Amino acid sequence: MRIRALTAVALVGGLGLTLAACGKEGTPASPGGSAAALPAYTVAQNVDVAGSPVFAKIKAAGALTVGAKDDQPGLGSKDATTGKFAGFDIEIAKLVSAGLGVDPEKITFKTVDSGAREQAIANGDVNYYVGTYTISDKRKQQVGFAGPYYQAGQDLLVRKDDSSITGQETLKGKKVCSVTGSTPIQRVRDQKLTEPGGSIVEFQKYSQCVEKLLSKEVDAVTTDDAILKGFASQDPEKLKVVGKTFSKEPYGIGLNKDDKALRDKIDDILQKAIDDGTWKKIYDATLGKSGSAATPPAIERY
């Protein structure tokens, strides 16, 4: 499950996290495509994040629970047979874990859909969340964000034989599908892009929207281009991405709103990864198989 073309930035490494031949291996790359291999991860030793209640719990447990998506090709997906999670975001979660001093093998990945992310973080059901989670001022009122680690843009997925949709301005009268609680569908609603005569359809998973698109029950699926390209790469004879982004969607790592110490630590991990080129190794072994270049984002500390 690979994405054909997208611009991404993989978070990797951190203070105390380095590449080493003897470290923990990341998620194996999918067969085919580039031969680039994921780097090994060395688990940082004697990590301390003073003033972080979440880190104190992590350290006491010696393990992590990370919220993620399980239905996004190339980003976060779960193998139906093995139950293992794989993808760009999954590797990011593992790299942060190693930087915090926890063996990535001790992560329990928990599927959390878009509409339930804030509650899962607030309840402490997950230590942090990595899953195409767009940073916004509204969300910052409920959760904290480290990053961004990736810059996406909203786009449209349509049937390959449909030439009537060429951008956001051509959605009038169309049925557009996305995930409940997501930034993209709220933008469609706020800007009234389907009016007059159109409608909005919402589901819990993007895969459900894609099924409705293929069965011609909706006209387009909208979300970040990275996600859409993943689905298009699975069925290129029937689906295509319009290719005209109309937003900037900075992906962040969601965590407890009041835990600034942990947020700062993860920002440090991200910055070092960008500076030393480690993120590029991760990108090349995952989303880099799309053939597009990657541009690191600027970390936005607050």
Give the residues covered by each predicted segment.
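Acidic, polar ligand-binding/catalytic clefts
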Residues: E105-E169
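Bilobed "Venus flytrap"/periplasmic-binding protein-like clamshell domains
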Residues: F85-L100, Y133-T134, A152-Q208, A220, ...
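Extended ligand-binding regions for polar small-molecule ligands
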Residues: G23, S34-V49, D162, S182, ...
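A ligand-binding cleft/hinge motif common to bilobed small-molecule-binding domains
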Residues: A116, Y133-Q141, R189-K192, L214-K248
